[in-house]
Amino acid sequence: FVCRHFIDRDMHKLAGLGLSYELDTSALLEQKGFCRHWTELATCNTGDSFLTELTDIEGDVVDMEAYAQAFVCTSKEIPFISVKFVSDVIGQNSVKHWEDKLADARTGLSHFFNVLKESI
């Protein structure tokens, strides 16, 4: 997944206080002319907890850090995307799957960036 839209599920709980919990980095990427050939849009849902069961969350993938990274980059006007490799399925022994899938993630992401490098 190539994510340009980010939701912080912890901040979402505070939305009634006027705090922002969603970011979309597409406009800055387009303005700078980056990633034009990536047409698929993916949403990353970020939070401080490791999810072990499926809950009502928005997004295509879940992590624990991308919203903060996107927030800092956006505030500094630095283009940001997050490339995600799905290492586990929520509710299906996620901790064990995550440990087992690290080598697969390394291989998959290496392939992704090698293909990207060749297309530039």
Please describe what each predicted stretch is.
Residues 1-120:
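Glycine-rich phosphate- or other oxyanion-binding loops that anchor nucleotides, phosphorylated ligands
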